[in-house]
Amino acid sequence: MHCMAVRHFAPSSSLSIFSSTNINNHFFGREIFTPKTSNITTKKSRSRPNCNPIQCSLAKSPSSDTSTIVRRSANYDPPIWSFDFIQSLPCKYKGEPYTSRSNKLKEEVKKMLVGMENSLVQLELIDTLQRLGISYHFENEIISILKEYFTNISTNKNPKYDLYATALEFRLLREYGYAIPQEIFNDFKDETGKFKASIKNDDIKGVLALYEASFYVKNGENILEEARVFTTEYLKRYVMMIDQNIILNDNMAILVRHALEMPLHWRTIRAEAKWFIEEYEKTQDKNGTLLEFAKLDFNMLQSIFQEDLKHVSRWWEHSELGKNKMVYARDRLVEAFLWQVGVRFEPQFSHFRRISARIYALITIIDDIYDVYGTLEELELFTKAVERWDAKTIHELPDYMKLPFFTLFNTVNEMAYDVLEEHNFVTVEYLKNSWAELCRCYLEEAKWFYSGYKPTLKKYIENASLSIGGQIIFVYAFFSLTKSITNEALESLQEGHHAACRQGSLMLRLADDLGTLSDEMKRGDVPKSIQCYMHDTGASEDEAREHIKFLISEIWKEMNDEDEYNSIFSKEFVQACKNLGRMSLFMYQHGDGHASQDSHSRKRISDLIINPIPL
């Protein structure tokens, strides 16, 4: 037998996810918040880490008498997606004959793509493949094609394009990591340095393309900033003229309205694919092969999602968290799974979706314990139990906390063992410290609530950017999506040096605040970023909301600076960080898409997970 060396990832005393970046200056300068850490030591081991499952005792703890405690309630509705319903999902589009047909269509599309040499039609096809949600099948071909375009630009061999073609080429090159300069748009400016007024007269297609390209702006890129203002103003006037019946409400009008609602760069891939497939089918110049492949691929992916969800649902049922025992908390397993579909949808990432959905569901339960149900004394007990990470501490907890702690303890240890088997890294200390830090941030907010403290926006963001839980999602994403783990990447993740992680979490926090403010204020909660800004500046709620939206756009500049194709992290991981930001905008676009089970929430889940597209 060969001895296998085990490497240990020793955590730092805290996870400073938000180190100094440009975006922090918009909040409060460069001072960084680091919660106090527990006295947990890292023990190295050459055997299996301390991952023994614990048995949940039914004996009452000394603190379990809650008969005289008046507790808050969020009155969460039970889940509308039952265990039996989830297990009955057909997963129809698996195996033959679908696999053979898909492979044949894929080859036809591939020939179509590579056969168009250096032409605008080729760029338009890449754009269409992206919006139909099937470009991931041709990643290598697209990168090779765009490399040639970038080389032509760098050597001044590129043809003289109009605004539409230039903007489309720019957006695609930026998306795939090519450093195409913003100055390429100077050709469309007049002698005063402003975009030519003539552009707006007869080139709505070009203006829309420039609008979409402008959202790839990085810090200091004034030309793209000007382009966004210029195009947004014009497109809004264009829609106004449509509403007044001055302009025909055609396919272009549909695309313009869609873009103004949210730019393509900010949208989540699967939701955009569902929408665009339906719109593309209505067009007269649609390509039948592309449409059939997009529909079939959507349905085949959906069958994989259904299998993944069934797996997670069985775990949830076995844990007993989904048996109406957590009446004070949100049972939103399907919504938790939907997040993971948006973060990484590709078929090879089933393991990631299954693991991360568990984590998101646990975050939801524990968040509600701290936000709604627990007393301050009980929350301090739970925090200490997570910090100690000792099975014996379960007997010190109130009865209602035992099952969540039991599930958390076993789930984290199980996942740590999986990482040990897969990557030969002992990570249990790091994983449990991540959860301990999250609970400390939750506890800090609970103290604010019980004391009536109103934090400044600075202080709120320092804590809330961590309490949103994004850093824990990224920890599990890192180990689930990374094939070859390096010490450099581990140290960067540990110290919070990676922009995509920081900004993905921060965007999640701010989008959550925009979508959940009304409901959380009704039940009683700490002030969110909107109220903090209002309190700091005297702004109205509308003004505060606009400021938070501005901060989100500034966060995107930081994320655009992060080149996923030249990073110490895997491309798959960096894309996951950015996609979490996209999913936060998607889930909170029409309110609280995670907790609420309104028509928007049901439609999202039905469209992406439940109902296939008719072929």
Curated annotation (Swiss-Prot):
GO terms for biological process: alpha-pinene biosynthetic process; diterpenoid biosynthetic process. Mg(2+) 2 binds at D367, D371. The keyword Ligase does not apply. GO terms for molecular function: (4S)-limonene synthase activity; magnesium ion binding; myrcene synthase activity; pinene synthase activity. (2E)-geranyl diphosphate binds at R330, D367, D371, R509, D512. It is found in: Plastid, Chloroplast. Optimum pH is 7.0. Pathway: Secondary metabolite biosynthesis; terpenoid biosynthesis; Terpene metabolism; (-)-alpha-pinene biosynthesis; (-)-alpha-pinene from geranyl diphosphate: step 1/1. The keyword Magnesium applies. One of its GO terms (cellular component) is chloroplast. InterPro entries: Isoprenoid_synthase_dom_sf, Terpene_cyclase-like_1_C, Terpene_cyclase_plant_C1, Terpene_synth_N, Terpene_synth_N_sf, Terpene_synthase-like, Terpene_synthase_metal-bd, Terpenoid_cyclase/PrenylTrfase. Optimum temperature is 30 degrees Celsius. Mg(2+) 3 binds at D512, T516, E520. Binds 3 Mg(2+) or Mn(2+) ions per subunit. A motif (DDXXD motif) lies at residues 367-371. Keywords: Chloroplast, Lyase, Magnesium, Metal-binding, Plastid, Transit peptide. Residues 1-55 form a transit peptide. It catalyses: (2E)-geranyl diphosphate = (1R,5R)-alpha-pinene + diphosphate; (2E)-geranyl diphosphate = (1R,5R)-beta-pinene + diphosphate; (2E)-geranyl diphosphate = (4S)-limonene + diphosphate; (2E)-geranyl diphosphate = beta-myrcene + diphosphate. It comes from the Eukaryota. Mg(2+) 1 binds at D367, D371. The Asp-Asp-Xaa-Xaa-Asp/Glu (DDXXD/E) motif is important for the catalytic activity, presumably through binding to Mg(2+). Belongs to the terpene synthase family. Tpsb subfamily. Involved in monoterpene (C10) olefins biosynthesis, constituants of cannabinoids and terpenoids-rich resins. Catalyzes mainly the conversion of (2E)-geranyl diphosphate to (+)-alpha-pinene, and also produces minor products such as (-)-limonene, (+)-beta-pinene and beta-myrcene. This is (+)-alpha-pinene synthase TPS2, chloroplastic. It comes from Cannabis sativa (Hemp). The gene is TPS2.
